[in-house]
From Swiss-Prot:
Transmembrane regions listed in the UniProt entry: 6-26, 50-70, 102-122, 157-177, 200-220, 244-264, 266-286
Subcellular location: Cell membrane
Lineage: Bacteria, Pseudomonadati, Thermodesulfobacteriota, Desulfuromonadia, Desulfuromonadales
Protein name as annotated: UPF0182 protein Ppro_2689
Record's GO cellular component terms: extracellular region; plasma membrane
KW Transferase (keyword) present: no
Source species of the chain: Pelobacter propionicus (strain DSM 2379 / NBRC 103807 / OttBd1)
Domain of life according to the entry: Bacteria
The entry's keywords: Cell membrane, Membrane, Transmembrane, Transmembrane helix
Membrane topology per record: Multi-pass membrane protein
Main location (coarse class): membrane
Protein's UniProt keywords contain ATP-binding: no
Family: Belongs to the UPF0182 family.
Length: 890
């Protein structure tokens, strides 16, 4: 008795703790949605989860309990005789005493578990309720694509649930009948009462109908199969498995009926023959015959028989990853680029990205981190109108790193150090005389060296803001350091949940497991707690059904406020005949741009692709969550860009799926690949350039292709980002009858250049680390430039400095101190001003005599450096001598 009470107490305590945990999460989450203004999203999801969970739980509870009650009311004669049956017959009285009181609790526990599972099916339920027609039908079954996206998942769930409910009811019913004596085990076999047989017959008949429904759904699931060559239903599936599933759909309930009749009448042969026939047909029609058909008919004539199904796979994969909108344009390369062409494309030249993300991040960290507790997490690429010029820039937010605080305690981490401060912002191609980046915005407080102003530099919401903070307390917040002392601030934004009651303080003290929130005298009724500050967590909390890009980027709006833009994707694994990527996804769209204010955490979700069928359904599911892209402020819309990761994914699929002819696809005649330097494939890169046939420069994302297992260029893919052209993708294809150098071939030519190789060797011997930047392919007019920056660092922890720029064109490769000098050397024309650090910066009208003296001085200094063993200095003087001689030759 005491033991039973102890168990009961443990159960009650466990249930109470679970309930309190649920209520705690529920209440604090509700307050978060109140803060963000998306309570309708919270309630819609809550009602859907509750309704779905209760529906599944209620059906299972009613179904199992009904069968248990029917089994419990049946009366059977007592099998009291023979002792010989004692080894097999249960002790009925003891078993009844145990089983009878457990019936309802067992059904309730099962219903509770199924209810939790059912609550997770809320999205499928809402998908079905809000489904829309796509307008495109699958080529095999003739169903609208929307059926597979929105209806089939729920049908599969209901079928699986019905099967589980019937099997559970069958098991529990057999158990009760066995205990009550309706099913008696003896040495002579199993004796089943007529009432039991009739009950079990009905259950088995219903189960056969569920199995038939499963066979019917298997017909549609064939469109998600794979035969190794392509995805989707193939010849064998359509001509063997599909007819078999259709026959089984009809035979299964007939076999179930025969089984039920045989069981009802006690005719065991009739009961077993029909199900056995279904099993045999399934094995032959789904396993044996398709294998024979594939081996002896399809394999010898594969292309001829599979061509229509390969065409289906190509069309639907292109639909799934938005490849069908890519415009293919021939690009006939010539090598007649002139200085006049370079001058006409000055905006493109000035926006070639010389600063790589990794070296620039390290340089920013050493030059602009200011204090150890600030950190630059990432560098983002964007474009701005700077001093009237359309410019590509690199921007990095200066966030607060709690791990690097000099004194880590609750007051410092939660009340004082609450936010990061400002940004570092500069051009992608300009270099100071020391080989360092130039800045448009820098320092704390922000200093603007251009017409970009940051008026609200505080960053309360960012990529490193992983912990809660409490603002408007009695403790001043740290804003930024100065030479004369620290500057403090008080939060003036709308973010956070007001701590205006004891109940809220208790709730958040429990959620964050600290009594300090409850006991601290620094917290007043005017204070607010800000949580879910990590921008990725914040947007996922509101829209967990979207996949968010892991590379958010910050922009400065016209008012000088800092905003985060995060690309969001809709996705599905339910597009028939489409090749899936890792994780099973075979449909994906970049349909949403999420915006988060870095100061007050305000959220907005804008639909950037209204043609996406999934976002149309989500918009119906959650009215008020999404806004049209036309509602986005112009100062933010100017910074919307085509996402790097999405184009990378599309490019990976496009390497094969640019081939639309089934024969070419089958033979892989024109298979492409993304070129690689070393082991890592090239990634798409942003640049500003004038596309062929266009009249103005624009911000694009670019990635080259090479033929499979070859190094020459095959094409380049570009995604546009500006204005009405946003989202338009073009593939420029090169002639296949001549060689166009690819990145790997250019890289090899750079390595083979004697002067460049010698210079790299000299730097390495000196102990410097040479960092070779990304090799960029830049289309200019109908030609291609290849540009690679070189960085030097004293050691692996040293400050990277951009010391040289390598440019290749046609058969020429040059290395100069900056891009302008390299282009002038290749194409001539007006010489660009040289940096102040150049030791040879002289007036172009210097007399030959003076140039000769300068050349002799450089030569003598080079010899002196050689004798001293200073090979780096020797190389520098040779470079200086070369430049003087070139000036003399002009």
């Amino acid at each position: 008795m005491i033991k039973n009470r102890f168990i009961l107490i443990l159960v009650i305590v466990a249930l109470t703790v679970s309930l309190l945990s649920f209520l705690l999460a529920f209440c604090t989450d509700w307050l978060f949605f109140v803060e963000t203004g998306f309570t309708s999203v919270f309630t819609t999801k809550l009602y859907a989860q509750a309704g779905s969970g209760l529906l599944f739980a209620g059906v299972l509870f009613a179904g199992t309990l009904l069968n248990l009650l029917l089994a419990g009311k049946a009366v059977f004669p007592t099998y009291a005789t023979p002792r010989e049956a004692g080894d097999f017959r249960p002790r009925l009285d003891e078993a009844r005493r145990l089983v009878k009181p457990l019936g309802i609790p067992a059904c309730a526990i099962l219903a509770l578990l199924v209810g939790q599972w059912g609550a997770m099916q809320w999205e499928k339920l809402l998908f079905f309720v809000n489904r829309v027609s796509v307008g495109t039908t699958d080529p095999v079954m003739g169903r609208d694509i929307g059926f597979y996206l929105f209806t089939l998942p729920l049908m599969e769930t209901i079928t699986a649930f019905a099967g589980f409910t019937l099997l559970t009811s069958l098991f529990l019913t057999v158990l009760v009948y066995t205990v009550r004596g309706g099913i008696c085990l003896s040495e002579r076999g199993v004796a089943i009462d007529g009432t039991v047989r009739r009950h079990l017959a009905i259950l088995l008949l219903l189960l056969s109908c569920v199995i038939a429904a499963g066979f019917h759904l298997d017909c549609f699931r064939l469109l998600f199969s794979s035969n190794g060559i392509f995805h989707g239903a193939g010849y064998t599936d359509v001509h063997s498995r599909l007819p078999t599933y259709r026959i089984l759909t009809i035979l299964a309930p007939l076999a179930g009926t025969a089984l039920a009749i045989g069981l009802w009448k006690g005719a065991w042969r009739m009961a077993l023959l029909a199900p056995l026939a279904v099993i045999v047909l399934h094995v032959i029609g789904i396993r044996v015959y398709p294998g024979l058909l594939q081996k002896f008919k399809v394999a010898p004539n594969e292309l001829a028989l599979e061509a229509p199904y390969i065409r289906n796979n190509i069309a639907l994969t292109r639909l799934g990853f938005d490849l069908d909108k890519i415009e293919t344009i021939p690009f006939d390369v010539d090598t007649q680029l002139s200085s006049a062409d370079i001058a006409r494309n000055d905006a493109t030249i000035k926006n070639i990205r010389l600063w790589d993300h990794a070296p620039l991040l390290k340089t920013y960290s050493q030059l602009q981190q200011i204090r150890t507790y600030y950190r630059f997490f990432d560098v983002d690429n964007d474009r701005y109108l700077v001093n009237g010029r359309y410019s590509q820039v690199m921007l990095s937010p200066r966030e607060l790193s709690y791990a690097d605080l000099p004194s880590r305690n609750w007051i410092n981490e939660r009340l004082i150090f609450t936010h990061g401060n400002g940004i570092t912002f500069g051009p992608v191609s300009r270099i100071s005389k020391e080989g360092l980046p130039e800045f448009f915005v820098k320092d704390i407080p922000a200093v603007s060296l251009a017409d970009i102003r940051v008026t609200r530099p505080e960053i309360y919401f960012g990529e490193l803001s992983n912990e809660y903070v409490i603002v408007r307390t009695r403790v001043p917040e740290f804003s930024y350091p100065t030479s004369s002392g620290n500057i403090n601030t008080t939060y003036a934004g709308t973010g956070g949940v007001p701590m205006d009651s004891l109940a809220k303080r208790m709730l958040f003290a429990a959620r964050f497991r600290t009594e300090k929130i409850l006991l601290s005298s620094d917290i007043t009724s005017q204070s607010s707690i800000i949580f879910n500050r990590n921008i990725n967590e914040r947007v996922r909390a509101v829209a967990p059904f979207l996949h968010f890009d892991d590379d958010p980027y910050m922009v400065v709006d016209d008012r000088g406020r800092l905003k985060w833009i995060i690309d969001a994707y809709t996705f599905s694994d339910r597009l028939p005949c489409s090749k899936p990527i890792k994780g099973g996804v075979n449909y994906m769209r970049n349909s949403v741009k999420a915006v988060v204010d870095a100061y007050d955490g305000t959220l907005a979700f804008y639909i950037s692709d209204p043609h996406d069928v999934l976002i149309r359904v989500y918009d119906r599911m959650f009215p008020g969550l999404f806004r049209p892209i036309s509602a986005m402020p112009d100062d933010l819309r100017r910074h919307v860009r085509y996402p790097h990761h999405f184009l990378q994914l599309q490019a990976a699929m496009y390497t094969a799926y640019h081939m639309t002819d089934p024969k070419v696809f089958y033979n892989k005649e024109n298979l492409w690949q993304v070129p690689a330097l070393g082991e890592k494939p090239m990634e798409p890169y942003y640049t500003i350039m004038k596309l062929p046939g266009e009249t103005a420069e624009e911000y694009i994302l670019l990635l080259p292709f090479t033929p499979s297992k070859r190094d020459n260029l095959a094409a380049w893919l570009t995604a546009r980002s500006d204005g009405a052209n946003y989202g338009k993708i073009r593939a420029y294809t090169f002639p296949r009858d001549r060689l166009i150098y690819g990145p790997k071939q250019i890289d090899a030519r750079i390595n083979q250049d004697s002067f460049i190789s010698q210079q790299l060797t000299l730097w390495n011997q000196r102990g410097s680390e040479v960092i070779r930047g990304s090799l960029l392919v830049i289309p200019i007019e109908k030609s291609l430039l290849y540009v690679q920056p070189l960085f030097l660092a004293a050691d692996k922890a040293g400050l990277p400095e951009l010391k040289r720029v390598i440019v290749a064109f046609g058969d020429q490769v040059v290395m100069e101190e900056n891009l302008e000098q390299a282009l002038q050397r290749l194409f001539g024309g007006k010489r660009a001003p040289e940096p102040a650090s150049s030791a040879t910066a002289k007036d172009s009208t210097t007399s030959p005599a003076l140039l000769a003296k300068e050349a002799m001085a450089a030569y003598e200094k080079a010899i002196s450096q050689q004798r001293q063993g200073n090979w780096s200095g020797y190389g520098e003087e040779l470079r200086r001598l070369e430049q003087i001689l070139r000036r003399m030759a002009q």
